[in-house]
């Protein structure tokens, strides 16, 4: 939509729009800024899983922390751990875990998958890697299964894709290793 000519975009009155939800993966910062400039402060960032729990960022909070997928919903909790389950400090990427006291789930017919994605404290993970900032806003790096390790360094394809997508001559990109 952003590639539409300005005269086409200006033909449409979007002033009545109150809310638009962006979900599934973090929106590239440049794309989100341009959409907010066009549509106004109506685009909310949303991150969640069917299993329960999630985050949300209203437009003003996203502008304060570009790239965030938000803070935990009321009554939900987030934590970031290393591969051994130890909590990581603010700003340190690790496995994202969520907890929603009012929700529970299991993978139908797959107790071992259910068990490996839950911890003793009732948190679950879908395998995303991210970090929390000092104000509790979650930033996603990538899915752990997509991470590339080269020379002992963790490389997140989504970060590279975001940088490449910022170039005006690029319409879409996929990075894999």
Predicted features and spans:
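Hydrophobic alpha-helical segments, especially N-terminal targeting/anchoring helices
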Residues: 81-82, 118, 126, 132
């Amino acid at each position: 939509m952003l590639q539409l000519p300005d005269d086409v975009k200006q033909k449409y009155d979007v002033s009545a729009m109150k809310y638009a939800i962006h979900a599934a993966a973090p929106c590239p910062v440049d794309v989100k800024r341009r959409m907010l400039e066009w549509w106004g402060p109506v685009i909310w960032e949303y991150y969640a899983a069917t299993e329960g729990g999630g985050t949300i960022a209203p437009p003003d909070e996203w502008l304060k922390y570009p790239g965030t997928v938000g803070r935990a919903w009321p009554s939900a909790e987030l934590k970031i751990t290393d591969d051994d389950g130890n909590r990581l400090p603010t700003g340190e990427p690790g496995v994202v875990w969520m907890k929603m006291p009012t929700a529970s789930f299991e993978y139908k017919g797959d107790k071992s998958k259910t068990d490996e994605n839950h911890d003793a404290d009732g948190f679950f993970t879908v395998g995303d890697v991210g970090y929390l900032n000092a104000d509790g806003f979650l930033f996603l790096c990538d899915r752990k299964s997509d991470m590339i390790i080269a020379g002992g360094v963790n490389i997140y394809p989504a970060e590279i894709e975001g940088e490449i997508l910022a170039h005006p001559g690029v319409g879409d990109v996929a990075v894999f290793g």
